[in-house]
């Protein structure tokens, strides 16, 4: 297990329990700092003996940025000073055994790092620690520090670490949190090779089943190589050290032209041709790094050794998000996959997931599971992590989660609950305990072994971790905290309240007229409660907040969701339904909650398959509805979802039976090229 990340002789609670292992493995000398920072006149930033240009550049960086945060310019000096100051010595040492080191001797603090990324992070750790003791330095905008300023040394757990979330993509804070800047790290990313090929993409289409197919690319094509080569030379250059992903399109088929087949391609295995291109590019550009993705047509491991500047990104899409216990079959299968890749490369990056991509707004308690997975990845040879989140779209608790995840990427042994508490204590002075208690309860709810779904609706979330009673209590209490909070805390709480109004609406819709629902039942009719309209009004405030335009990966707009609520659920004040409360049955059997939804008198929303629809995945179903005692005349309405982009379609035919005899057959016709939303049939 990777446990020796960093250590100190005077450990804060974040490092408790690590000291024995850390001391044994690193051998750093321990010395505590006895004076507080405010006891001296200021800070002298300098360099050691035989300085390099990098030493000087980083010393000037710290001088300039510490000076900006000081309430007196003269309390921060560079090079020499006659004042009684703390002396901070900056050194870059590529031969350093650890990634970073802090050495304390009297009033001298020496910061040494092996590379620029760790030096930047280390300097902001210093600034934050100084600001906590010295009121003359402002570090209020910085996240909590995760190390103590005593003699300390350590190494980042992973060579590459990035988080694709609003906070993780903020260029002002990626380096502060020790993250790689995602936008600057990759010359080509993911399945974006077509953007590089541009207008010439038609020249490199794949051959599938003997025909040219524009859904996939040919990786043995000389034109493909030349286009990528020109792109790198013209846009990136040959002297830098960028990373590039060379991957097929997101389809399961591979090119089987004569050239690709000669390299070893088969119908669903593109690894041979992709590997040859990877080897060729890595030789052509030895200072850059080239990766492909272990996913779909490139999931099969190559039999060729990859050079030091080539590697693999392994998708964890088939490794469910649940507590790791060493017993799960999918866990063992993923371990075997990593072990196979370890035989051909040391550069193994993991593409993992930290959001529910069908719902960015409902809290997603990923932190403790992510910690376990990071330990697992490290033990099994991973050298880099890409956490795929909500991108630039708002996600509830994102700033806190990004802080905790960035700390765990540096050291997976840090205690999650302490990190969460430190963040809330700093950012939410009024509501810190209330937020902490609720969020940690969510985290603990999934430690029983339940799976976190990354494409889940509200019903699945409730089954996994989202207790309706606790959530509703939390949501209802939020208004008082928003009213009582001040400044930035009030704005952030208001933002969270607005986002969670989506969750409250979804929970209300899912529960219909039960105690957690949006409506009340009176006999054979239901009526929306006044509170439901308040939730919708609160959600309409999303325009006030950056990034809160969409609620999922498919870029479904919050405004459209609101419009559908108003059009389909709240349009009529009272809804009468003679089938209300009658429980259907099905052959073959299907989800009982789904069947109950058929007669709950709550309209499904056509824009989202999670919103009120019953999924029937088999070719043929028989739905039985007991109607004994109903002697009134009227129309029966059946609504079907038609959402081709998500592969949801209405049936081709409906047979209506009464007392065992078919008395009506309805044939349905839909245009798959048109997004119809729903198809209503009156019987």
Regions found by a protein language model. Give the residues of each.
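Short, well-ordered secondary-structure micro-motifs within conserved domains or adaptor modules
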Residues: 66, 74-98
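Structured mid-domain segments that build the active-site/substrate or prosthetic-cofactor binding neighborhood
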Residues: 223-224, 332-433, 437
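Disordered, acidic Ser/Thr/Pro-rich linker "stalks" and the adjacent N-terminal cap
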Residues: 564-633, 639-650, 669-676
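Short, surface-exposed beta-strand/strand-loop-strand elements in extracellular ectodomains
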Residues: 646-661
């Amino acid at each position: 297990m990777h446990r020796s990340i960093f250590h100190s002789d005077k450990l804060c609670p974040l490092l408790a329990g690590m000291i024995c292992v850390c001391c044994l493995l690193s051998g750093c000398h321990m010395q505590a700092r006895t004076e507080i920072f405010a006891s001296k006149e200021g800070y002298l930033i300098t360099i050691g003996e035989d300085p390099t240009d990098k030493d000087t550049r980083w010393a000037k960086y710290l001088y300039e940025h510490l000076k900006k945060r000081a309430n007196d310019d003269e309390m921060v000096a560079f090079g020499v000073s006659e004042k009684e100051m703390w002396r901070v010595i900056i050194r870059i040492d590529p031969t350093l055994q650890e990634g970073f080191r802090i050495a304390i001797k009297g009033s001298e603090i020496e910061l040494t790092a092996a590379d620029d990324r760790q030096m930047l992070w280390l300097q902001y750790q210093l600034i934050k620690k100084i600001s906590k003791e010295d009121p003359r330095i402002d570090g209020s905008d910085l996240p909590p520090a995760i190390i103590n300023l005593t003699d300390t040394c350590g190494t980042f757990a992973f060579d590459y670490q990035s988080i694709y979330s609003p906070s993780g993509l903020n260029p002002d804070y990626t380096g502060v949190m020790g993250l790689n800047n995602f936008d600057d790290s990759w010359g080509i990313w993911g399945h974006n090779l077509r953007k590089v090929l541009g207008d010439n993409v038609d020249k490199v289409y794949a051959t599938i089943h003997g025909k040219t197919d524009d859904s996939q690319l040919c990786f043995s094509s000389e034109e493909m190589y030349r286009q990528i080569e020109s792109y790198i030379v013209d846009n990136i250059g040959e002297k830098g050290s960028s990373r590039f992903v060379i991957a097929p399109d997101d389809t399961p088929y591979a090119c089987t032209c004569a050239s690709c087949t000669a390299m070893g391609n088969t119908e669903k295995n593109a690894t041979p041709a992709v590997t040859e291109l990877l080897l060729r590019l890595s030789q052509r550009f030895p200072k850059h790094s080239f990766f492909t993705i272990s996913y779909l047509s490139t999931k099969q491991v190559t039999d060729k050794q990859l050079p030091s500047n080539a590697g693999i990104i392994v998708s964890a899409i088939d490794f469910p998000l649940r507590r790791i216990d060493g017993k799960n079959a999918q866990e063992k299968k993923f371990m075997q996959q990593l072990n196979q890749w370890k035989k051909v490369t040391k550069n193994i990056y993991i593409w993992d997931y930290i959001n529910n991509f069908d719902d960015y707004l409902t809290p997603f308690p990923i932190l403790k599971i992510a910690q376990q997975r990071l330990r697992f990845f490290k033990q099994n040879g991973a050298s880099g992590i890409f956490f795929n989140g909500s991108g630039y779209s708002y996600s509830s608790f994102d700033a806190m989660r990004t802080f905790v995840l960035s700390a765990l990427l540096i050291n997976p042994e840090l205690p999650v609950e302490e990190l969460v508490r430190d963040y809330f204590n700093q950012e939410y002075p009024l509501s810190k305990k209330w937020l902490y208690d609720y969020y940690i309860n969510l985290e603990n709810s999934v430690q029983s072994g339940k799976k976190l779904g990354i494409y889940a609706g509200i019903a699945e979330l409730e089954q996994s971790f989202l207790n309706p009673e606790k959530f509703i209590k939390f949501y209802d209490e939020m208004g008082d905290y928003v009213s009582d909070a001040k400044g930035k805390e009030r704005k952030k709480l208001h933002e969270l309240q607005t986002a969670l109004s989506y969750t409250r609406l979804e929970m209300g819709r899912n529960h219909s007229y039960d105690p957690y629902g949006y409506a009340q039942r009176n006999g054979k009719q239901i009526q929306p409660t006044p509170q439901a309209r308040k939730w919708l009004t609160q959600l309409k405030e999303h325009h006030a907040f950056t990034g809160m335009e969409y609620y999922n990966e498919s870029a479904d707009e919050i405004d459209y969701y609101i419009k559908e609520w108003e059009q389909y659920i709240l349009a009529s004040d009272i809804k009468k339904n003679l089938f209300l409360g009658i429980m259907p049955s099905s052959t073959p059997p299907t989800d009982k909650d789904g069947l109950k939804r058929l007669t709950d008198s709550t309209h499904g929303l056509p824009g989202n398959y999670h919103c009120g629809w019953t999924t029937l995945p088999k070719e043929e179903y028989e739905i039985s509805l007991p109607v004994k005692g109903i002697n009134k005349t009227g129309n029966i309405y059946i609504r079907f979802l038609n959402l081709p982009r998500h592969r949801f379609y209405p049936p081709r035919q409906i047979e209506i039976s009464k007392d065992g005899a078919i008395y009506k057959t309805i044939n349905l016709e839909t245009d798959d090229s048109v997004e119809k939303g729903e198809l209503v049939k009156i019987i």
